[in-house]
Amino acid sequence: IPTKEDQYGYLDPTNLRSCYAESKRMAETMCVSWFHQYGLPTKIVRPFHTYGFGMSLDDGRVYADFVADIINDRDIQINSDGTATRAFCYIADATIGFFTVLLKGENGQAYNIGNDQCEISVFDLANRLINLFPDKNLKVIKNMVANDREYLRSNVSRNCPYITKVGNLGWRPTTSIEDGFTRTICSFLNYV
């Protein structure tokens, strides 16, 4: 880690959580197959933890849960030890990355889209987000046993993209965690 485009990792097909990653692999294989067999122009983007206005706040992703908690004036609950790290990319940066790949990328190739400079632990993200809105007087609570029976813990302790390949096309993300999440949370507060 950081994860390059040619690194596929190990997946246990008997693990319930593997269906998500396996379905993405299958879709990429189909796209590349159609490109090679039929000449269908295909470029693949692999987004890493993209957030921003319009994202679903109830899909179970940790950052969506945190944003929903802040919007609804709830303390942030972490259902783990909070040490897992993720690299978060603001939607405006990701969108520019997608268009960069579309316009400049090579057919049949995959490109990681993410912000390698915004890797942060779940616990630190929660604290940074509540510190963006100190007037709300929120706190972070570590809840080592999830209350939700449907909650599935991730066994991925670190997830960060290697973005040199798309960088060679001229793209780099520019939005910090503080700026991106402030914009995101304010957009929901102003929308509601």
Language-model features, listed with the residues they occupy:
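Catalytic helix-loop patch of NAD(P)-dependent Rossmann-fold dehydrogenases
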Residues: 1-44, 49, 56-59
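C-terminal substrate-binding subdomain of Rossmann-fold SDR/epimerase-dehydratase oxidoreductases
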Residues: 4, 70-192
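Glycine-rich "substrate-gating" loop/helix at the edge of Rossmann-like oxidoreductase active sites
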Residues: 16-20, 48-60, 80-92, 115-118
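A general structural signal for well-ordered alpha-helical segments in protein cores
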Residues: 28, 63-64, 122, 126
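Histidine kinase transmitter module recognition
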Residues: 34-37, 54, 69, 169-173
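Positions that flank functional sites
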Residues: 50, 63, 181
